[in-house]
Amino acid sequence: MGTADERRFEVLRAIVADFVATHEPIGSKSLVERHNLGVSSATIRNDMAVLEAEGYIAQPHTSSGRVPTEKGYREFVDRLDDVKPLSMVERRAIQGFLESGVDLDDVLRRAVRLLAQLTRQVAVVQYPTLSTSKVRHLEVIALTPARLLVVVITDSGRVDQRIVELGDVIDDHQLSQLRELLGQALEGKKLAAASVAVADFAGQLSGAGGLGDAVGRSATVLLESLVEHTEERLLMGGTANLTRNAADFGGSLRSILEALEEQIVVLRLLAAQQEAGKVTVRIGHETEAEQIVGTSMVSTAYGSNDTVYGGMGVLGPTRMDYPGTIASVAAVALYIGEVLGAR
């Protein structure tokens, strides 16, 4: 890339930085005063004219200054080479705060609250999806001789409980056998594969009286409730930050709040995160969701030992501190995975 192109990118970078900081359109005079660009105000004006003609910046109808466009933000993000990692003190503070969580729910609640505070945006964390989780432990408890409670604990720390209504009563010996059979079929396997194995057991024991019926009914509950109808859950924090940035969204704040409440759009974007440690930035129309078109989303996946548990990230205005937000999202995701993987 030629010298003029490099210089224009430095001008664009300065416009983005100043607009994010001030929320005021940026003129050539202020760029000369605030940044050591090494050229005259006239040269900067010419560079700004080229950037505007190419669609990287635009002029608000009431101002002589310029603001970045979605294309300008995208160019800025694509050429980031100075995403400064959080300091050791900050990282230790994050790790210690998350490690203090007593269980999965508490860890994720802490994570979403922390991320909202770090970025001053709306933070979202997807609960670990059962379909990608492995079973760490399974327990079967007799509530009555004809009613069981099946408890599944995944490697991400998620606990799910399901009631199994039996067609007949089973005794303590059969209950022990059932627990052993289900444990052999499930533990260490992803739920989709484990449920198929349980169903195979059910077929093999179809003529075994009460035990075969119990295995079959348990398999049905596990298959239908834990695999085919996986409940997608989303934790959210910092929605008040949207109100603080209301001017950034024009008249679209209501539709953004409605999209967050419905969760479907956000879950779809988080579900696309399949690689822990890789941060994705979607700017404006890149979200492909009309309800949140005035926003940007910075997201990644979290997990442990090459297993992705779920997605997480932040949602805010396109006028966002992208380097700081990217660093915060990456750090919190890393430590969520480490904390959950160690349990």
Curated annotation (Swiss-Prot):
Q: Does the keyword Lipid metabolism apply?
A: no
Keywords, A to Z, come to: Repressor, Stress response, Transcription, Transcription regulation
Q: Name one GO molecular function term.
A: DNA binding
Question: Does the keyword field hold Repressor?
Answer: yes
Q: What is this protein called?
A: Heat-inducible transcription repressor HrcA
- A Pfam match: HrcA
Q: Which organism is it from?
A: Mycobacterium ulcerans (strain Agy99)
Protein purpose: Negative regulator of class I heat shock genes (grpE-dnaK-dnaJ and groELS operons). Prevents heat-shock induction of these operons.
Annotated GO biological processes are:
negative regulation of DNA-templated transcription
Cleaved signal peptide residues:
none
Q: List the disulfide bonds.
A: none
Q: Which family does it belong to?
A: Belongs to the HrcA family.
